[in-house]
Amino acid sequence: MLIVIFHKAIFSNSSLASSTLASSLLISFSSFLFISSVCLFTSSSFFADSVTCSFSTCSFSSTFGCFSSSFLSLSCLMSTLSALISCSACPRLSVFTVVVSASLGSVFTILTDS
């Protein structure tokens, strides 16, 4: 609901290009907060796995994916889903596997946007 209110406010006060970018940033930031909270609550070791998961997988995949795509596009949603899946399995994965998974999500985002 809050995202919809911000989205309407942005669209009524600025041009289409800048509002799309601002909406993408808003979605990116909110998805980062949501996925990071999921990471923190699903990890077994709070100070090791959750930090690795939040800043390696979530911020890279979800933020980059939503920033490079339009508001609520398929690639943004798929990138967020990819980060969520990676983060939910983060305590059981090595750092290398998590980084590769985030990279694949971002590559998928670039391919679907072009």
Swiss-Prot record:
<protein>
    <recommendedName>
        <fullName>Putative uncharacterized protein YGR228W</fullName>
    </recommendedName>
</protein>
<keyword id="KW-0812">Transmembrane</keyword>
<feature type="transmembrane region" description="Helical">
    <location>
        <begin position="93"/>
        <end position="113"/>
    </location>
</feature>
<feature type="transmembrane region" description="Helical">
    <location>
        <begin position="21"/>
        <end position="41"/>
    </location>
</feature>
<keyword id="KW-0472">Membrane</keyword>
<keyword id="KW-1133">Transmembrane helix</keyword>
<feature type="transmembrane region" description="Helical">
    <location>
        <begin position="65"/>
        <end position="85"/>
    </location>
</feature>
<dbReference type="GO" id="GO:0016020">
    <property type="term" value="C:membrane"/>
</dbReference>
